[in-house]
Amino acid sequence: MIETSKRSRIINKINNVVISDYKGAIFVWGPKSTGKYTTIKHVLESNSRIYCEADCNEHYSTASLFRSLLSTLRNINKFGRRKPINYDDDDEYINNDINKDNEEDNNNNNNNNNNNNNNNNNNNNNNNNNNNDGYDDGYDDDYDYKDKSLNERIELLKINDLSKEFNNMIIKSQIYSKKIPATSIPSVSEMVQVLYEKASTNETISIILRHSEKLMKFEGEFFYSLFKIEEFTDHPVCLYLLSEIPTERILSTGKEFKPIRNIHFPQYEPNEICSIVLNFKPNFSIINYNQNNNDSNNSNNNNNNNNHLKLKEEDNIKLYNKLVELVVRVFHTTTRDIIDIIFVCHNLFPNYIEPIYNGTCGVEDSDSILYQNIESKIVKSLRNITEKDEIVLEDQKRQQETYQIYPPQQVPQQQKQQEKEKEKEKGRQLASYSDAKNIPYHMKIVLISCFLASSFSRNKDKLLYTKEAVKRQSLSNEKTTGSKWFHFQRAREIGYKLFPSEKKALFQESIFKSLASLKYLETISSIEPAFTYKFKCTRRVHLEFIKQISASINFKIDTYLEAAQFQIISK
């Protein structure tokens, strides 16, 4: 586990929770690929704790969720090795019988090691005589057990012991499967009791649930009951609810629930990503070996003996550090997944150092020559990361259909222009998707309130944001115009009404200025105070972009867009 300055504080928090044997639920939230699951798993395994895990995105009922928790229950040895908990830990009489049989087998082996070779020779002679006498090689029921050799007896004893263990495991698995049938809906207390029966321990069991926001779709009030898990059971249980959305956005505001402990994982900064990726360096010796083999093959084919440079390990480390910094600068706006960045760096490094092997540039030369060698591959890797698999498959099918109808040289010009326009639209959609994914949570709230303030006039504020019953009628012909100018104070009031649980400190002047610097908002410069400033949403803040932002924080913006089609009936 790689620790940074911010992660060390979070690890200390989780470590204190584990050491103090905390009982209850803990909500762990943060953006995607911030190390929530790996950090908790690392702390539990380092402290040798019993835990089980499940991904709520893969289950649609409590029965299937409880089955996956039961199958993933893990115990940690004193040596730090992870092992599954066996069903046969409680059956002492079977283990004692097996141990006794093993001791007898070991004694027989130690006493009769010198006679085994003689017995094997005698058996071979007897088998030859039996074959000559017409004896059948197949299994005979009348064949006496005493006439067998010691090795055959030992093998039969081991087979019998294994059959006992196998039968016992089948019986135990049937018992546990009867406790949680697929058709029933077990309660939380029943599930915890089954986990402790399987683990046969009095220590705390940790339960990790990823994508816990999906539990809101389960039957009944199951998600709210998890907050009171320590009240339902007498066994010590610590529940980790992992999500990318804060608790205030998941839970409904009308219900009362117990305040839950929160642990926030902030997003990785570019320097933190570099420090993590640099710990996963490729094998430089294999890369050098492959480069030398390719150079030798080319020299044999062309009859040229060029003097290729041999890089030292220090030079490889310096060049890899430069490549990682370059890749992180290019990729951190689209993705911050560390696994993707490591994969890209390992694939690009042999091509990155190819000009140095060829002798076209040195180790300490400018990076422009090295970057030109991998520029096309960086663009391809960016497309592979940002584009979804469905879009790639649709493009392949469309290209195959066009090439079957028209040869590559006879494609009409109109079709080429349409393809270029479609590619531009896809690029805009992908850019907006990446922007919506990387914007922080508090800026998303401000952008939603600014979009509503810029799209609709002040006359509709009472219709959209009031909680009182208002008479309204539909508009048959409504003229849709572009974004309008709005005051800072109006956007702040809309944000207070849409997100009452959030702190008022979020809607400050600094956030609006930062959005204006990022070209999400336009401003009118003035010497007056901030609350008299006027703002307007730019073209980057369009409807699809706002829908993606609202979906990421579980905010239903369609209800406000549908309500805007009406008008208040004047009394």
UniProtKB/Swiss-Prot annotation:
GO terms for biological process: DNA replication initiation. It is found in: Nucleus. Residues 417-428 have a biased composition (Basic and acidic residues). Keywords: DNA replication, DNA-binding, Nucleus. Residues 107-133, 407-416 have a biased composition (Low complexity). Belongs to the ORC1 family. This is Origin recognition complex subunit 5.
